[in-house]
UniProtKB/Swiss-Prot annotation:
Disruption phenotype: Sterility.
EC nos: 4.1.2.13
Protein name: Fructose-bisphosphate aldolase 8, cytosolic
Principal localisation: cytoplasm
Family: Belongs to the class I fructose-bisphosphate aldolase family.
Gene: FBA8
Organism: Arabidopsis thaliana
Cytoplasm found in the keyword field: yes
Tissue specificity annotation: Highly expressed in flowers.
Length: 358
């Protein structure tokens, strides 16, 4: 049997293509309450609902930012939240031409029988939740699987388990009208070289697309959110051109042309690094049947967060910092970023957190 055809097939295909529009990308603002608490703590702001809402309102109403975006990933709390003047965030995004998305996984747990590898929870009741999220205005979803590189990792067991979970999630989303973002993140932690990362990335993506095929997922109505192929965090850095070459080659070998767009995660790179690497990929003269874009969280928000510091009088400057990063990444999706963005506070600092939990 070929791809499963849901009653939403045409809508899924149109929305996936829209999210992949060159010149646009995704703002990942789906941090769990615990994770956003750590971000707020870094600027000495208390983790209460009002402050979380204030930060998200700052992001979603920043002048000039929304035209650079095609989607924003929300945490469940934010899907139902309103701005200070009583307007649903979902409506603010839609009016700005941005599709709302929703994080649907329930985090990772250790995979029994492995050396600290993980699997992602959240399949129980997923169909009902997707239906509810669609009714609330969400049009795409995200599920993060996490793999690590070690002497014997990732194991075949971990690769298979995570690929299967992603495929199961993807088909359930499509049954309920949500475009699934398939995110198999290979953590940057370690001292491995770029060749090792490339080999592991190819193995993981090949397994994911085999699982998606086995589950009859409509590839035209999906997006891929992979890591860039880079050396490990404890290894010497390489140039954006080298990262671009290894990343695009790994994708050419594994990602079917039916997939409309690949939206990279930033994986703890600095804001500027992530943008330069994406730009280098789009400048590569080679076969790329999918658009290459971004789905950045930390790499879009860091300088904004530092500029804001929880103070009302800093909102305008913080929104300007967000616009600068959105514009830079918009240009990077077209391969036209000149590296001339005004670097905000924190734009050049590494955002790597070992064993990162979202």
């Amino acid at each position: 049997m070929s791809a499963f055809t849901s009653k939403f097939a045409d809508e899924l295909i149109a929305n996936a293509a829209y999210i992949g529009t060159p010149g646009k990308g995704i703002l990942a603002a789906d941090e769990s309450t615990g994770t956003i608490g750590k971000r707020l703590a870094s600027i000495n702001v208390e983790n209460v609902e009002t402050n979380r809402r204030n930060l998200r309102e700052l992001l979603f109403t920043a002048p000039g930012a929304l035209p650079c975006l095609s989607g924003v990933i929300l945490f469940e709390e934010t899907l139902y939240q309103k701005s200070s003047d009583g307007k649903l965030f979902v409506d603010i995004l839609k009016e700005g031409g941005v599709l709302p998305g929703i994080k649907v996984d329930k985090g990772t747990v250790e995979l029994a029988g492995t050396d600290g590898e993980t699997t992602t929870q959240g399949l129980d009741g997923l169909g009902d939740r997707c239906k509810k999220y669609y009714e609330a205005g969400a049009r795409f979803a995200k599920w993060r699987a996490v793999l690590k590189i070690g002497e014997n990792e990732p194991s075949e067991h971990s690769i298979h388990e995570n690929a299967y979970g992603l495929a199961r999630y993807a088909v359930i989303c499509q049954e309920n009208g949500l475009v699934p973002i398939v995110e198999p993140e290979i953590l940057v932690d370690g001292s491995h070289d770029i060749q090792k990362c490339a080999a592991v990335t190819e193995r993981v993506l090949a397994a994911c697309y085999k699982a998606l095929s086995d589950h009859h997922v409509l590839l035209e109505g999906t997006l891929l959110k992979p890591n860039m192929v880079t050396p490990g965090s404890d290894s010497p850095k390489v140039s954006p051109e080298v990262i671009a070459e290894h990343t695009v080659r790994a994708l050419q070998r594994t990602v079917p042309a039916a997939v409309p767009a690949i939206v990279f995660l930033s994986g703890g790179q600095s804001e500027e690094e992530a943008t330069r690497n994406l730009n280098a990929m789009n400048q590569l003269k080679t076969k790329k049947p999918w658009s290459l874009s971004f789905s950045f969280g930390r790499a879009l928000q860091q300088s904004t967060l530092k500029t804001w510091a929880g103070k009302e009088e800093n909102v305008k400057a913080a929104q300007e910092a967000l616009y600068v990063r959105c514009k830079a990444n918009s240009e990077a999706t077209l391969g036209t970023y000149k590296g001339d963005a005004k670097l905000g506070d924190g734009a050049a600092e590494s955002l790597h957190v070992k064993d990162y939990k979202y």
